[in-house]
Amino acid sequence: MKEIVLAGGCFWGVEEYMSRIEGIVETKVGYANGIKENPSYEEVCSGVTGHAEACYIKYDESIISLEELLNKFWSIIDPTVLNKQGNDRGTQYRTCIFYLDEKDLNVIIKSKYQEQKNYRKPIVTEVEPLKCFYEAEEYHQKYLKKNPGGYCHIHLD
């Protein structure tokens, strides 16, 4: 099994979208690469902790490759916009690819390069090693499964 953490705006929609993909075996939402240990949702939303709302993904590489997974990720975000996705604004809504395995970096860079060909503006999606990931509060986990009419900036239909 492989792991990656993706940030694409509000984590509810990213998690719900990713959980529907064949080969994804686990998802959980949380706060990635900030400066405060174990922050609360309110602290992250204040913008002072530096965390991104993110989705941890465990996937079966024999079913879906990292390249395919990243192509799906690019399809649900606007990678040219800084600190905003949909109606959500703030540094916690920036787009990021956080890798856990250094061997994945070349695939990620190649994918970002290929995606750039679709845009005139530069892609601002961060590519960084995962430094920390704190699971979000339980009410955020599988939020759109528990609240099917809940807010989502991603078109899930």
UniProtKB/Swiss-Prot annotation:
One of its GO terms (molecular function) is peptide-methionine (S)-S-oxide reductase activity. GO terms for biological process: cellular response to oxidative stress; protein modification process. This is Peptide methionine sulfoxide reductase MsrA. NCBIfam families: msrA (TIGR00401). One of its GO terms (cellular component) is cytoplasm. It catalyses: L-methionyl-[protein] + [thioredoxin]-disulfide + H2O = L-methionyl-(S)-S-oxide-[protein] + [thioredoxin]-dithiol; [thioredoxin]-disulfide + L-methionine + H2O = L-methionine (S)-S-oxide + [thioredoxin]-dithiol. It comes from Clostridium botulinum (strain Kyoto / Type A2). Gene3D superfamilies: Peptide methionine sulphoxide reductase MsrA. The active site is at C10. Pfam families: PMSR. HAMAP family: MsrA. Its EC number is 1.8.4.11. Keywords: Oxidoreductase. Has an important function as a repair enzyme for proteins that have been inactivated by oxidation. Catalyzes the reversible oxidation-reduction of methionine sulfoxide in proteins to methionine. Belongs to the MsrA Met sulfoxide reductase family.
